């Protein structure tokens, strides 16, 4: 049965094209182009790293073979050399004929035995494919990609995906396959089969993590998105704990904490199968968080997990926070002993303002990025800018990520520090200079343009702010306010606000854009597929926010209502509020 293209709109992104039905039958979100572009960039880097690792392993395997070849060749050359006593021509000819032939055969056999095999093209699983746009872009844009398996539990989505596969031609047909099945069941029944697993659900990925971890090959790549930011950022802490096993805190760093909660949850699922993760890139963009981690199997390396997790103590009165590691290691002879961490790291009351602490976590406190990966991905993206529809955005995010302090979890907000003290804010460059002049490190964060990552302790941070307030006095406040308690103490560190050359990052010095506005209105999450689109949705969140298409049924109803209603009736209509006000005025008169 042929598809009537009049009922569809062709949407092109990158090199892929999909047919989108006007009745919102299958989910599609234009804003996720950033997500898809970033995934393609990371996947390209994964293929490159995978090839390098394979070549390195192959070279190690071929070294013994080369030594054997050299040894056989040297022995053969000795046999070929005539002795001083002399040899007859017949014997010499036989030796010369047999020697080289035997030498030439053995190395050939040895070389064949240790010949490096080319790695198989990576097999990719898109667990929740919907329209199949992501799978189609992987197949058409990434060189060397293998089979792409697209799954969905919704029959309409599978039919749409299959329709789009045919619409994209022979390359898509040969590489992409679509199945109507539960992604969890499929991943559980295909353990360690996929080199890449992509989870991009509508909401939380928590129910897919256990099966996804099992389906990734050793050294494979797991890409995971979470869009339930209200839960991850502390809006519903008990729900977050039930889904991810961590309790979130409502603070300025909540979006980075969301990333670290997701990483900790993935690590927890991996540990159940003697596996562990190595994050290569973790980003927060738009309305979601996205992590890219490699999955490895090692019972011994898995023991380091408690060293990578921490609880967070957040003061309820000021911006002070402290991290409490879950475990610690103690070297003993040639082995390592793992012990519980020593704590607590804070007193019951805050040392700075005297208020209590909230405790959250555990979160992933190890690095969220691999700097080598980030630099390589950024360079690759810049060299192929024409192939990324969202180049400006992803290059800006990667640039900021490349300048972050990797070993500093969470961050401070300069505006929040000033809000606590109720003082005017110093410039970011001045504050950074003061931290650097105190022999500490500081950087920005891709999560928040006002955020600052630093390894300076909170005592130094508050001393900097105390000295700033001394030079810029404020009005008297209630002595019970956290800001008053902090300012009542004298600084214990010398503060130097003189401009430091490192107060601006390389990107800032070159005036490279790092934080970009949304490209259009209503740039965010869209309606779930299958929901009835009404004129109310359009009036509230805009025409484009409902995938850019109103159903013909609603358009026809709207036109009929407008035609059925005479213009005189529209003019005679009175707002009930205005009518009531007018009646009250007449009564009062």
Curated annotation (Swiss-Prot):
Residue spans of biased composition, Acidic residues class: 558-569
Highest taxon listed in the record's lineage: Eukaryota
Chemical reaction(s) catalysed: guanosine(26) in tRNA + 2 S-adenosyl-L-methionine = N(2)-dimethylguanosine(26) in tRNA + 2 S-adenosyl-L-homocysteine + 2 H(+)
Outcome following mutation: residue 200 to A: Loss of activity
Keywords noted in UniProt: Metal-binding, Methyltransferase, RNA-binding, S-adenosyl-L-methionine, Transferase, tRNA processing, tRNA-binding, Zinc
PROSITE patterns per the UniProt record, alphabetical: SAM_MT_TRM1 (PS51626)
Family annotation (Gene3D superfamilies): N2,N2-dimethylguanosine tRNA methyltransferase, C-terminal domain (3.30.56.70), Vaccinia Virus protein VP39 (3.40.50.150)
Class of enzymatic activity (EC top level): transferase
Region span, Disordered: 51-122, 550-589
Biological processes per GO annotation: methylation; tRNA modification
SUPFAM superfamilies registered for this protein in UniProt: S-adenosyl-L-methionine-dependent methyltransferases
Compositional bias of kind Basic and acidic residues: 68-81, 106-122
Function: Dimethylates a single guanine residue at position 26 of most tRNAs using S-adenosyl-L-methionine as donor of the methyl groups.
Protein name from the UniProt record: tRNA (guanine(26)-N(2))-dimethyltransferase 2
